[in-house]
């Protein structure tokens, strides 16, 4: 099969690799029909992710068709069209039982702080990813979800990571009816977080960025108010002005991690919780 393979920092190429096989009775083999490139894949490409080994296949956002199932798999059948979440989890350990599946104890032999992730180095288990023609899916009864016939592939693939991350960020904010929500960053995850905030009852949603194209999408796609931080000396002060000097009830930070170190947050002191850091692995 063909796969996108890591060959060192700033070096990736499409190569021939063996088609993966069932290694455990709970495995499934999925033929990939669509894969996406995540912004975090750049961390691998730039050589910033520890223990990214030569020959590793990238890709943690993919959908496909089940080609083979192990003898213990009960919920999937050959021919099922499925979306596969980016993280791998057993569904039964202490963490999984408490909804913390990205910290699963049974899927990563190389670390204890994080569970398994497809195509994201041996630090997260060394599982080859979905930027390939086929992928082995462990614990196939736990992660994959059948895609309804009416859903297009281009929509379904967003559910593997980007859409789920934005929604989860809003969910972690414990938004209540009428809350003012500020979303920092108007990229895809930020836009989905803004849309999700409305679904959870927000009374106002304000998106902060400086790229005009993204701010325009925040207005047209997420129906949010927008703030261009290039136009203000102090964004926190400006946000407080726009909220009767109370600040936001919830802040969802959808920027790259290096962007928010040591910064003040425009949070209402009544809020009772810290800002939500949008991350599939480490909610703040």
Where are these regions (language model features)?
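NAD(P)H dinucleotide-binding glycine-rich loop of Rossmann-like/cofactor-binding domains
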Residues: 92-184
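N-terminal Rossmann-fold NAD(P) dinucleotide-binding loop
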Residues: 190-191
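Glycine-rich beta-strand-centered segment in the early N-terminal region that forms part
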Residues: 20-35, 48-97, 101-102, 128, ...
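Short glycine-rich anion-binding loops that position phosphate/pyrophosphate groups of nucleotides
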Residues: 35-37, 257-258
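Cytochrome P450 core scaffold surrounding the K-helix E-X-X-R motif
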Residues: 40-46
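Adenosine-nucleotide cofactor-binding segment
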Residues: 180-186, 198-281
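Residues located in well-ordered beta-strands
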Residues: 2, 13, 18, 31, ...
């Amino acid at each position: 099969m063909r796969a996108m393979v890591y060959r060192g920092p700033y070096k990736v190429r499409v190569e021939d690799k063996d088609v993966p096989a069932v290694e455990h009775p709970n495995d499934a083999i999925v033929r990939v029909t669509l894969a996406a490139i995540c912004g975090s894949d750049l961390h691998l490409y730039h050589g910033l992710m520890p223990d990214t080994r030569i020959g590793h296949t990238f890709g943690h956002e993919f959908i496909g068709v089940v080609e083979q199932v192990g003898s213990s798999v009960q919920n999937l059948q050959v021919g099922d069209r499925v979306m596969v979440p980016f993280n791998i989890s057993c569904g039964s350990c202490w963490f999984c039982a408490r909804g913390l599946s990205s910290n699963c104890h049974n899927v990563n032999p190389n670390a204890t702080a994080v569970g398994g992730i497809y195509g994201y180095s041996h630090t997260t288990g060394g599982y080859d990813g979905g930027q390939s023609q086929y992928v082995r899916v462990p614990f196939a009864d736990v992660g994959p979800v059948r895609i309804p016939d009416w859903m297009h592939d281009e929509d379904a693939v967003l559910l593997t990571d980007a859409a789920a991350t934005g929604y989860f960020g809003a969910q972690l904010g414990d938004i209540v009816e009428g809350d003012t929500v500020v979303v920092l960053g108007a990229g895809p995850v930020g836009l989905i977080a803004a849309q999700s905030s409305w679904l959870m009852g927000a009374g106002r949603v304000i998106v902060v960025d400086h790229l005009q194209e993204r701010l325009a999408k925040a207005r047209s796609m997420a129906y949010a108010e927008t703030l261009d931080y290039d136009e203000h000396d102090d964004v926190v002060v400006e946000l407080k002005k726009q909220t009767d000097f109370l600040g936001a009830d919830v802040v969802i930070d959808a920027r790259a991690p290096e962007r928010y170190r040591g910064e003040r947050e425009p949070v209402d002191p009544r809020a009772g919780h810290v800002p939500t850091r949008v991350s599939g692995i480490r909610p703040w």
